[in-house]
Amino acid sequence: MAKNRKTPDMNLPMWFDGQNINEALFCEEFLQERRIIFANGAFFTPDGRVTDDLPLRGEIYDKLKFCAVNNIPRKITNILEVLKLEAQVSDFPPEQDRIHVANGTLLLNGTFTEGRPAIVRSRLPVGYNPDAPAPVIWLNFLDGLLYAEDIPTLQEFIGYCLIPSNKGQRMMVIKGNGGEGKSQIGAVLSTIFGTNMKDGSIGKISENRFARADLEHILLCVDDDMRMEALRQTNYVKSIVTAQGKMDLERKGKQSYQGWMFARLLAFSNGDLQALYDRSDGFYRRQLVLTTKEKPVGRADDPDLAEKMKAEAEGIFLWAFEGLQRLVANNFKFTESDRIRENREAVKRDNNNIFDFIDSEGYIQRKADASISSKDFYEIYRMWCEENSLAPLKARSFSDAMIANAKKFNLEHCNNITNSAGRRVWGFMGVEAIARPHINGFYGDSPCTYVPEDIPEEWRQVE
């Protein structure tokens, strides 16, 4: 064995000549004693990814402390850099068909293998115990927090987060008015996921191009108190939710690289996740929006509830695994109640008032053989917004939103519409104007001041 290799003249390891340490020989011996690899910018062991290298430095120090060499901390740093080269493998793909837990490996078909012989990407701190009691406190908590038909969706989503896969292509937002206890879910999940879960901010992910790299190797990112501001850009968030394989990641001051991304996003909020400019169906389609029940008046909250539920971790894991198996059997299509679908539609409508405008009466009507120019269509829309005290979209945003939803509204966007001046312009087939802003009274700034006729004569006199 390498650990018994000694110099012929002194009772010293081969990597130490009495004065100097040979880092390459040290790493060669270290790797024969320790199962560890370096891939995708991180060390991995049978315990999963090394998130804190202090214990690793401690192991190296234990081997070096008998050596009378100067500046051991710097020497340890040098050894770690050499170890990255010595232990490097070209790639370490995630295993999507199994869950590595504290006491072994659980396959999606329910087969369990005890022991931890292999180096793995991630290992959950919870153990697999098929005889674990049902998590009664957890289930009672969910029953008081969520509507019964929405609980299976949460069960499937938590189970979905157990494996490194984004095949479901969904994120989850749990919305309430505050005080319901929804953030207790995050505290319980931290016991199940350990270092494979990260507290983060969806707002930061959307704004900061470096934030995605912080989610590399992570199974679940929890935003415990999502900001209410609408996202200025959504491409970073959407790319994480739909990532299937490697994606371009960037860290500050370093060149971008291709890294594995399979982090799922879970947010708790008092409002909806909205986009400032993105009104595409794709942004909202990827959200599972659960609403909480109202907090009962006079309910006494248990300050130790989270700790009690954490004690049921093994049972909660079995409950989540059941949800994962159901999701996989359904080809990664989540169970969605009518309420969840209505929530998603409401979020979309709140952020894009063209849906309410299209359904309004007295302004337009959908008619197969009718047409309207884009300019007139927008002017009627502005009129509707002003009369309903709503902020109108800009002309380009309105047109883009109408084009994106043309099929849903049975409209056709084309450039052979004839306007009132007889010129051919862009517009829409399938809709007819009822209200005409330039005819039906004042719209926008009035061109003159209206003076009633029944005012006293002396008020009309000018000094």
Residue map of PLM features:
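Replication-associated primase and helicase/ATPase modules
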Residues: M1-R34, F44, R49-D52, L107, ...
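Intein modules and their embedded homing endonuclease domains
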Residues: A2-Y128, W260, L393
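P-loop NTPase catalytic core of nucleic-acid-dependent motor ATPases
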Residues: L31-L56, I99-H100, T105-L219, L288-T291, ...
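Positively charged interface segments
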Residues: Q32, T77, F193-T195, G200-R209, ...
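Alpha-helical scaffold elements adjacent to nucleotide-binding pockets in ATP/GTP-utilizing enzyme cores
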Residues: E59, K63, I185-V188, I218, ...
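Conserved nucleotide-sensing/catalytic segment adjacent to the nucleotide-binding pocket
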Residues: A211-K254
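Loop/turn-to-beta-strand initiation segments
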Residues: H217-L220, M261-L265
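Phosphate-handling catalytic cores of nucleic-acid transaction enzymes
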Residues: K310-N352
